[in-house]
Amino acid sequence: MLVHKQKCRVCGNPNLKEVIDLGEQYFQGCFVKDGVQPPPRRPMPNVIVRCCPEDHEDACGLVQTLHSIDTDLLYCNYWYESGISQTMRDHLQGIVNTALDITGSKSGKVLDIASNDNTLLRNYPKEFTKIGIDPSSIAARQTDKDIQVINTTFPSKQVNNLIEDNSADIVTSIACYYDIDDPVRFAKEIKRLLSTKGIWIFEVAYWKSLLDNLAYDSIVNEHIVHYHLQPLEAIMKKAGLKFFDVQKTPTNGGAIMCYITHEDNFEYDNRERRQNILNLKIEEYEAYLDTDKPYVEFREKV
């Protein structure tokens, strides 16, 4: 089922302005292979719009696709495996190391949403309870004895039945949050699962980097939202969460690593991390991301 979105996925603003129309495209996350469920052959529109802060004082500025599709269709024949690339294996190990450094944890419960082939989770010491959540056929094939794989989307009733509230010390979701049709609900469910001093680390492609690099080939129908800091902060506020750090990374042409915790947890607050957040806010303000200017320039160059 193809759904035409009539409002912003974060703040509900109905004033959506077109950024660019890239025409109809086939699913990018699937390949035709013998003996494997063939992907849908029907293309879908790839139109990008933005929530306009100029038109409504509560607008968040999110950039998003105008359409979305059933995730069962997107992931029925998903091909990408994290462990194929040494670069990605090193990157995911670095994320785990950072999470352990921040929390100081020697044991506990860790969740990886969009766990794929379990590459990230394998980096945790054996003292941790490891849970992966992923709807893909790749996740369904994993057989690690010390990793519980829940082969479904997040959030879901199945996850709720299997994971207790306030039990997760570290949650990661790498390169998946931009695929989520209801990011506010997703964040609220993360909050429900996080322990009192738990942290959520996620990495997403950075919209400003895409604009700067003219990377229109990164605009695919799997990625239904394109994030910068302003709409992400709006999401966290709605969910009772907050940023305690943010860092730019070179992943896939430019991304941001986001560090989140409960809004009333000040365990990880320090001057350097606050400055990182401020620096990105200044950079986005100076890029006029809340105006038509960068989007008109982008469209004309494409």
Give residue spans per PLM region.
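Short, glycine-/aromatic-enriched active-site segment of Class I SAM-dependent methyltransferases
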Residues: 27, 202-225, 229-232, 236
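Conserved SAM-binding strand-loop segment of SAM-dependent methyltransferases
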Residues: 145-161
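A short glycine-rich, Lys/Arg-flanked "PGG" loop and its adjoining helix->strand segment in the class I
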Residues: 184-199
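Extended interfacial segments that mediate partner engagement and assembly in macromolecular machines
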Residues: 40-47, 56-142, 220, 294-302
